[in-house]
Structure formats: structure tokens, C-alpha cells
A protein has these predicted regions:
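Glycoside hydrolase catalytic-domain context in secreted enzymes
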Residues: 1-705, 711-725, 736-737
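Edge beta-strands of extracellular beta-sandwich domains
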Residues: 729-733
Length: 737
């Protein structure tokens, strides 16, 4: 449909029809099958405005959605199709590693492939829009939704956001198997005070623009069709009613011209923030800020028409919002084919097909981070007597909290994966402990997880595990967070594994010191005790449908881990939020070298995290040479090539990710101690070496000045090239102007 036809359609629509295009309801209003992702309350919907609603959240399945679409369009005066939306975060039925784990791959193109597969499965099930990617910058591991981000670095986040948008949307939204991406949560949702979900966000203008906005901008530049508002206040004003944030910054400065949708009930919640007195005022604030779709409150549908008639808001605001929604439907080709890709036969053909599972296995392997490997205890030797112990040994729930479409029956356990590929009569398998303590109950999206073991059963599990550990050469301890301990509304002040699992670790360590920990989590954890007791730690996150096979491949050396941390693992929760790209202080502290008390440091713990951003080991070892610069100065139109030689000094083929960091030594605005500017992956055979060249241009030296624009300044810069953000391999050059 042409723009002229869309404008004519808009002109023919009644005010009620336009307003209700701006309302979103669940499929439960149509067929009783519903998945909820927010607090349920009296939403104020009537049968009339539901029958005119513009979009549906929380329903899926080709047959179901085609039926809803058909019945809806028959009743609609202008036969305008519905949009079907769902949180397809890291996969549909084929689940990939959580986004934080995908960030550990340092391979955005792999995430693009994963998003493309997720879009294919979702689209044949009738969906048009996913509420992904979440590109919020995260620094606080107490916040449960760090699992949905790709980490603490704005450059890395931007690359992954771009890749995921491209993967979901393809070359055109009208293409087969393309769905519209929604960048979220705008803005600053990843910086809640005290790491408590939905909490206040206080960010300086400089920090907000330089660290938090770039990844949103990357998604917009990649063509994301939607942006979602965040629940939180930003410097005292709720984002969903923040006209400066949504109109001045998002639409005017960042050039976003797509659909802006609220998060679940977020328009209503600006009343609870104390920003509005009632639902009518909330509707006025949100529509004035440019929020096009009200997700699940009924505030728009029950208030806007009368407010227009009373002259309290301009109808032009309704028209511009409705037109953006119609444009999105048109871009998806729904006016020509309202069912788009929905197809039951293709659901059976594509969902969980072998090709998709193969990609899920590859993505899982590349997300694993080897944190520790003393005495080269990994990879495992099959002839050894190995005891696999822990609540994750026979657990099929290897996907993140948002994977409510996935089915655990489609997932292989670690026990099954080991027996399938590396069967050995010397291996034993036992649970050892419950996942959680007996008094812990977790509620997820329509599901609960509560332990039902008696004290006697727990003691029996523990004794069985201790005996198995005594008789084993090596213990593989599969432990970590439950999948429902991370995600939305899962803030934790204690970011350690559950106490019952810590007790299991303690008892096993008493009888066998050859412990390999396979660590599952949706966030960085405080793993000091694990680090003391384990000889090896393999961080596997929440790895998805093919996670168990990927873990088995890695443990037994079929795959050599190469992942790098996208988020620092704190020494303890007292450091949080901790991140590598902090500003220097006037009294900087050098760990292990500076004994002066009057420095910026803790008295009881180190300043540095236990494992820093960019860190990750391999089964082999790599040696990185000193940095060679082809010149020691450049002007704004020039470039410098920084070269290192990396050599595989170990006994097996492996992949290293070399990382380039830059530090502006003296600037008009204090710069971070280092910032990631580029990275390159290199795969080498034993003894092989390769020259790796990074090109430095003025673009990498730009920063946000006091003038509010990005500029470079003449002066000296340090560059660091190494295997993680703590590398001391450096050189320097001068920018002349």
C-alpha cells in the first residue's frame, strides 16, 4: 500500500478506530489462551475497543493466530489486520544461549544467525514483532535482567544490537520469515539504583549520552521498527511520559521514526511514580511524549477519544501515532497478506529442525568461558573415573527465564549428552542436592518452582554424591542459579549460588580436590568460594536447547572454549556495580604496588574484579608480542596501524580474541582508563603464529565534549592490545591537529 493510500485510510477512520489501533491486548480476549508478562488488574477494556485493538501480545501458533486474524478482520470496519507480538528474546522453540552468553562469543555475526532462526520459527507460528533486542548497558549483577543484555561495554553492545536487528528483520520486513525488531528499554533501564528492578535511574547527562545511548542508536541505525519505553524514571521523570526523552532525544536527535510502544502497563505505572494524578493525565502525558501503543492498560482506549472531544489533547497526536502503526503493518505486508508467514506445515518443518539445533549447539559452545583450568585438568580424559554431580546433571531447564515458549522435553540433559557421545563405564551420575533450598519458591511466567524434598531425601542425595566423589578421579560439579533466578523481577542482594549447592561443594571438596565446576547462571556471580575449591571453572550461562551436548563437547575436548566475559565477575557483591571502563580518580590505586592508605581503594578487598571484562582462557596458551606501531603520530585524516604477533604456544588448536583498548591520557573531559575499540578473533594450530593488525583512525578517538558533540582532541593516547581488559601490553601515539 502506498503512503497516499495509508493517509486516505487514516482519513476514513473514526476517532475511536484510530485510538484503538494504539491499544494492545492479549490473545486471551479472543481465544482464552494467554501468556502474561506483567501484573494483572482491571484493565478497563470493553468489547467494543477490544474488537478494534491494533495489536495482540502473548499468543502464538499458526492456527490460533490465523483464526484470530480472520475473525478480527471480518468485524473491523476497515478490515485492518492485527499485529501479533511476543518476547522472542533468544529463540522461539529452538532456544539459543541467553543474550549475555551470546555477548561472550564476541561474534555478532553468530547472533545475527541466531536471531534469523528465531524469526523464522516465530514467523511461521504467526508472529510479526519480537520485543528484542534488549540493548540496555548493564554494570550491576544484582539486577536480574542483565541476562538479556550483551554486557557492560557500549561498543560491544552496539555491535550485537545491530546484528540482532538485522537477524530478526532481514533485508525487508516483507521478506519471508522476517519479523519486526523492538529495541528496548528506552532508556537507562539497565542502571536501576541498588540493582533493584523497576527502580529509579539517576544518570548524568554525560554518562547517559556517552555510555547508555550508543547501543540504542545502533539499533535505530540498523532499522529497528519499534522502540519500547522503560518502566523507570530517568532523573526524576518516568520514561514513558518523558517528552524530552521520547520526542527531543529519541525522535529528533536520534532520528527514530518507527513505532514507540510502552512496556507492560508502563503508562498506568507513571501514576504510581507520582508523576500523574489519574489515568486521564497519564494518557495525556504518554501520548504527548509520542508513545504510540499502550501495552495492556486500556488507558488510551478509555480516555483519548473524550479528551480529544474536550479539547484536552490534539487529534493530530492521535493521527501521527496511528499512521506510524499503519505504516508498520504495511511494511510487514499485512494489508496484502494478513497471515504473512503463518503456516502449520512450516511450523512442523522448521521448528526445532536439525539445522536450527546445529546452530544452537555452535552458539552455546562459543558462549562458554573457561575461567580457570589449573593443572590442565580440562579437557577430561575418558579413561578417568569421572563423577558427574549436581542439580544440573539431570536438569532439562537449560534456557533462560524468557523462554516460556520452549519445552524442556526438547532438551537433552548433561547426563544424557555425556552418555550419548562419551559413554564410559567409569562415569557416575547423581544429583547431590536440590537446586534450591526447601524454603525457596520461584514464580515465573505461568510456572512455579518449589522444592519438595524432605531433609532425609536431601541427606541421602548428599551422601550418594560424597561416596561417588570419593571413588572418582575427577568430579564434574554442575551447579548454579536456577533459570528462574534471573530475568525480570529477580534482583538479588546475594549473587552467590544457592546455599544448598554451596554445602554440596564444601562436602565434595573435603573428599576430592579434583573438581571441575560447570557453572550455570544468568548473571556474573560472586564465585570466590568456588574459585578456591575448584581446579577448573567453565561458565556456561543458560545455554539453551543444545546446551548439554555443547557442554559435553567442551568438557571432553571436542571443542576448545574461546568465550570472553562480556561483563566483569565481581570479587564480591560489595564491588557492584563494577566495570572495566571506569574513570580514573585523583588518587588512583595500583593493585599490589601501592600501599598508601589515602588512595581510592577498599580496605578489605581488591579494587579489581575477580575476572575482568574480556577475560577467558583456552585449553591451549597464546603469547602476544609487544605492540609495533607503523608511526607514532597522526593527524585527523590519517591512521596508525598497530601490529602484534600472536602465537599458539600450547598443544592444541585454539581461538584467541585479541582486544584493542584506547586511553586518552589528558582531555577536556576525563576519559575512562581504557575503552574497547576493536577486536579480532584468531584461530591457530599448535606452534603457529600470525600477525594481527588494528587500524586506528580519528573515529576511535572521538568523545562527548562539554559542547555536547563528539570531537577528538590533540594529545597523547595509550593503546592496549591483549587477551582481556586488564592487559598491560601497551604503546602510545600522538594525535596532532
Amino acid at each position: 500500500m502506498t503512503e497516499q493510500k495509508l493517509t486516505e485510510l487514516l482519513r476514513d477512520m473514526s476517532l475511536e478506530e484510530k485510538v484503538n489501533q494504539m491499544s494492545q491486548v492479549t490473545g486471551g480476549f479472543f481465544n482464552g489462551e494467554i501468556v502474561v508478562t506483567g501484573p494483572m488488574a482491571d484493565k478497563g477494556f470493553t468489547e467494543d475497543n477490544v474488537n478494534l485493538a491494533g495489536s495482540v501480545i502473548g499468543s502464538m501458533g499458526a492456527e490460533t493466530l490465523k483464526s484470530i486474524q480472520k475473525n478480527y478482520m471480518e468485524k473491523h470496519p476497515h478490515h485492518i489486520p492485527l499485529l501479533f507480538m511476543l518476547d522472542v528474546i533468544n529463540g522461539y522453540k529452538t532456544v539459543f544461549p541467553i543474550p549475555l552468553a551470546q555477548g561472550a562469543s564476541f561474534e555478532p555475526e553468530l547472533s545475527e544467525q541466531c536471531a534469523s532462526v528465531a524469526a523464522k520459527e516465530a514467523s511461521v507460528s504467526g508472529l510479526h514483532v519480537t520485543f528484542a533486542p534488549m540493548t540496555d548497558l548493564v554494570r550491576d549483577a544484582r539486577w536480574g535482567r542483565v541476562m538479556e543484555s550483551t554486557g557492560e561495554d557500549p561498543y560491544l553492545n552496539s555491535l550485537f544490537c545491530t546484528a540482532m536487528v538485522r537477524g530478526f528483520q532481514g533485508n525487508s520486513l516483507k521478506d519471508n520469515y522476517a519479523i519486526a525488531a523492538c529495541v528496548k528499554h528506552f532508556a537507562g533501564y539497565g542502571a536501576p539504583t541498588a540493582g533493584r528492578d523497576y527502580n529509579t535511574v539517576e544518570l548524568s547527562e554525560h554518562t547517559f549520552r556517552e555510555f547508555y545511548l550508543p547501543s540504542y542508536q545502533a539499533g535505530i541505525d540498523a532499522g529497528a521498527a519499534l522502540v519500547m519505553t522503560s518502566f523507570n524514571t530517568v532523573n526524576g521523570i518516568p520514561a514513558t511520559g518523558n517528552k524530552k526523552l521520547m520526542r527531543d532525544i529519541l525522535r529528533e536527535q536520534m532520528k527514530f521514526d518507527g513505532v514507540l510502544i510502552s512496556d507492560w502497563a508502563a503508562i498506568e505505572e507513571i501514576i504510581y511514580h507520582g508523576y500523574c494524578a489519574d489515568r486521564e493525565e497519564a494518557a495525556a502525558r504518554a501520548v504527548d511524549a509520542g508513545v504510540d501503543i499502550d501495552m495492556m492498560t486500556g488507558i488510551y482506549s478509555e480516555n483519548l477519544c473524550q479528551m480529544v472531544r474536550d479539547g484536552k489533547i490534539r487529534e493530530e497526536l492521535i493521527d501521527e501515532a496511528c499512521l506510524r502503526i499503519l505504516r508498520l503493518k504495511n511494511k510487514l505486508g499485512l494489508f496484502e497478506n494478513p497471515y504473512k508467514d503463518a503456516d502449520q506445515k512450516k511450523e512442523q518443518e522448521y521448528i526445532l529442525c536439525e539445522e536450527h539445533r546445529k546452530l544452537a549447539r555452535e552458539a552455546a559452545k562459543k558462549s562458554f568461558v573457561l575461567l580457570k583450568n589449573e593443572e590442565h585438568i580440562l579437557p577430561l580424559e575418558q579413561q578417568k573415573k569421572i563423577a558427574f554431580i549436581g542439580p544440573y546433571v539431570d536438569n532439562r531447564n537449560l534456557f533462560g527465564a524468557w523462554s516460556f515458549i520452549a519445552d524442556a522435553k526438547d532438551v537433552m540433559t548433561l547426563h544424557e549428552a555425556v552418555q550419548e557421545q562419551y559413554v564410559s563405564e567409569n562415569s557416575t551420575f547423581c544429583q547431590g542436592s536440590p537446586m534450591l533450598g526447601a524454603d525457596v519458591c520461584l514464580e515465573g511466567f505461568g510456572e512455579q518452582q518449589q522444592q519438595s524434598y524432605t531433609k532425609e531425601q536431601e541427606e541421602h542425595m548428599l551422601q550418594e554424591a560424597v561416596q561417588a566423589a570419593k571413588e572418582a578421579d575427577i568430579v564434574v560439579l554442575a551447579i548454579g542459579e536456577d533459570r528462574l533466578q534471573s530475568g525480570e523481577a529477580t534482583s538479588n542482594a546475594n549473587i552467590r549460588i544457592p546455599e544448598v549447592q554451596e554445602a554440596l561443594l564444601d562436602r565434595i571438596a573435603e573428599v576430592n580436590q579434583n573438581i571441575v565446576v560447570v557453572l550455570f547462571s544468568g548473571r556474573p556471580l560472586d564465585i570466590r568460594e568456588i574459585n578456591k575449591k575448584a581446579k577448573a571453572i567453565l561458565q556456561v550461562w543458560l545455554p539453551g536447547t543444545e546446551g548439554a551436548r555443547a557442554i559435553a563437547d567442551t568438557l571432553f575436548g571436542k571443542y576448545n572454549p574461546s568465550g570472553k566475559l562480556p561483563m566483569s565477575f565481581p570479587y564480591c557483591v560489595g564491588q557492584v556495580p563494577v566495570h572495566y571502563n571506569e574513570y580514573s580518580t585523583g588518587r588512583p590505586h595500583v593493585e599490589g604496588k601501592d600501599k598508601d592508605r589515602f588512595r581510592s581503594k577498599y580496605l578489605d578487598i581488591p579494587n579489581e574484579p575477580l575476572y575482568p571484562f574480556g577475560y577467558g582462557l583456552s585449553y591451549t596458551t597464546f603469547e602476544v608480542s609487544d605492540i609495533h606501531l607503523d608511526r607514532t603520530w597522526m593527524d585527523t585524516s590519517g591512521q596508525i596501524e598497530a601490529e602484534v604477533t600472536v602465537k599458539n604456544t600450547g598443544n592444541c588448536t585454539g581461538t584467541e580474541t585479541l582486544q584493542l583498548y584506547i586511553h586518552d591520557i589528558a582531555a577536556s573531559v576525563v576519559r575512562p582508563v581504557r575503552e574497547l575499540k576493536d577486536f579480532k578473533k584468531v584461530t591457530l594450530r599448535p606452534g603457529e603464529e600470525k600477525k594481527v593488525v588494528f587500524t586506528i583512525t580519528e573515529q576511535q578517538l572521538l568523545f562527548l565534549t562539554e559542547n555536547g558533540i563528539y570531537e577528538s582532541e590533540a594529545g597523547e593516547f595509550e593503546i592496549f592490545i591483549g587477551k582481556d581488559s586488564s592487559t598491560d601490553n601497551k604503546a602510545s601515539f600522538v594525535l596532532k591537529k
